[in-house]
Amino acid sequence: LLSDLNSKIPVVLEPIGLQAVASGTGKEYGEIEYVKEEYENKIKTKDIVVYTSGLGGLFKPGLPVGKIFKNNAKKINFFSDFKQLEYVKIISYNFEGNN
């Protein structure tokens, strides 16, 4: 799950178009990591929506992950409430090139 402490996925921050990594914290929110320095200046003026970027091939691009409010530039407020999950479906597949 994205909220898992060991989870990291490539994301894109819109409307500014910067790529970053969303990291789970083990809590009800995530954090932005590995983002360009210009990010801090751009987020001061607007709220940011976090989407999957599609890099790495694990998730399709454009899946909404959460929102970042300008008063806390590193915290992702997930759109999903992971505490409400009762069941999780696990799908196993091979990445291209893996056997």
Language model features with spans:
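A secondary-structure micro-motif
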Residues: L1-N99
